[in-house]
Regions:
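Surface-exposed strand-loop-strand hairpins of Gram-negative outer-membrane beta-barrel proteins
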Residues: 53-150, 314
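Extracellular/periplasm-exposed beta-strand and loop segments of Gram-negative cell-envelope proteins
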Residues: 59-63, 120-148, 181-255, 285-316, ...
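Transmembrane beta-strands of outer-membrane beta-barrel pores
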Residues: 50-54, 177-183, 257, 281-289, ...
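Short loop/turn motifs that connect adjacent beta-strands in outer-membrane beta-barrel proteins
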Residues: 21, 31-42, 147, 158-173, ...
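Residues on the lipid-exposed face of transmembrane beta-strands in outer-membrane beta-barrel proteins
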Residues: 153-159, 175-177, 259-267, 279-283, ...
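Outer-membrane beta-barrel "beta-signal"
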Residues: 23, 366-380
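Transmembrane beta-barrel architecture of outer-membrane proteins
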Residues: 148-154, 170, 254-260, 274-276, ...
Length: 380
């Protein structure tokens, strides 16, 4: 009996050993092979950084007409007239009729409704001069004023395609966008032809009041305004050239958005450093506001000023090239620093005054932009 038990134990152990050996052989048939492992290599790269560009050029020019706001009326007789340095209007004196009503006085050819700004308007022979001025600038040829370096933001996406002729160099395609501002201003003193229209009125032998004067001038309920004869005695016009008579200020502000697409080349240098190059087409969308302010100080009266503004935009096709040095911080992120050149053409923007007499232009040239770019890159 003991012999039988021992025989059964030996048989059971042998059977277990045989089963274990078969199981191990079975598992061994399905061991993973090296060929079954998949290694994922990132093909896309996103770059986010800044772009600083110089080389934008602007130029300003044109011609303008500045005139004081006035209404001259008829060149003879009695009329309401407004000048740059005063006015002569219809008489506003009244008297009280028997019924106690205020009624206009019987016309006597004079008026209390007048005024002037400068003491030089009173002449030695007892007359008063009133003036209207017009300054017509000589054509201002285009004056160049280049904007300073403009910094903006850029974003691009790159797709790796493959190796170049079996080498370690790789090529791909890239697309991106960036935005940079345009801001520049300049000023110049322009020569101008000054046309002065002078109207003469009589004070009837009395002295002119102290300038500046505005009538009617009631004092204690009694109108003591010095009177001037309403009839225009004489009108004359004179034109003379004046050097640096008109101050013009030109200002341009805006931005341009660049969309680019092209091919890229990746050249490994070391384990962490590499060089990258790209070139392709670019489409720039530029939007700018052009402001012009002019001023002219005549002999009498306040400074004559005029301001005008216009907004414009343009689509400018062109090309770009850039070269970059890249540093890999790890397998999926890195830094880049490079140089860029972009040519996007030019356009002309014009601004015209409300009366259509002044017209100035600015030429915006984006055909030779160059600068630096830097930022971070992420692969996925």
């Amino acid at each position: 009996m003991k012999f039988l038990c021992r025989a059964l134990c030996v048989l059971l152990i042998a059977n277990c050993a045989l089963f274990a050996q078969r199981t191990e052989e079975s598992i061994g048939d399905f061991e993973p092979l090296d060929d079954d492992l998949v290694l994922y290599i990132p093909k896309f790269a996103v770059k986010l950084g800044f772009r600083g560009l110089t080389g934008a050029k602007t130029a300003f020019g044109g011609t303008g007409v500045l005139s004081g706001r006035s209404f001259l009326g008829a060149d003879t007789g009695v009329d309401q007239r407004g000048y740059h340095d005063g006015y002569v209007a219809f008489d506003s004196r009244t008297v009280t009729d028997p019924a106690g009503n205020q009624v206009p006085i019987t016309p006597d050819g004079r008026t209390n409704n007048w005024g002037f700004t400068d003491s030089t308007q009173a002449t030695a022979d007892g007359l008063m001069e009133f003036h209207t001025y017009t300054a017509t600038t000589s054509y201002a040829s285009f004056q160049e004023k280049d904007p300073p370096a403009a910094f903006g933001v850029e974003l691009s996406v790159e797709r790796e395609i493959g190796n170049v002729f079996g080498t370690r160099m790789k090529w791909g395609v890239i697309g991106g966008m960036s935005i940079n501002q345009i801001a520049t201003s300049t000023s110049a003193e322009l020569n101008a032809d000054i046309t002065t229209i002078t109207d003469l009125y009589s004070l009837g032998g009395q002295a002119a009041p102290t300038a500046p004067f505005t009538g009617p001038f009631p004092a204690g309920g009694v109108d003591n305004t010095p009177l001037i004869y309403s009839e225009l005695l004489r009108r004359s016009s004179q034109t003379a050239n004046s050097t640096n008579a008109v101050l013009s200020n030109w200002k341009l502000r805006g931005a341009y958005l660049s969309f680019r697409a092209g091919a890229s080349l990746f050249v490994p240098i070391s384990e962490r450093f590499s060089a990258a190059f790209s070139a392709g087409a670019v489409l720039a969308y530029a939007g700018t506001t052009y402001d012009v302010n002019q001023s002219f100080k005549p002999n009498t009266g306040d400074t004559i000023v005029d301001a005008m503004s216009s907004a414009d935009d343009a689509l400018l096709p062109g090309y770009y090239v850039d070269a970059n040095l890249q540093f890999a911080m790890n397998e999926t992120s890195g830094l880049y620093l490079g140089a860029v050149y972009q040519s996007s053409g030019d356009y002309t923007q014009t601004v015209t005054s409300e009366d259509g007499l002044s017209k100035y232009s600015t030429r915006v040239d984006l055909s030779a932009l160059q600068g630096v770019r830097a930022g971070v890159s992420f692969k996925f």
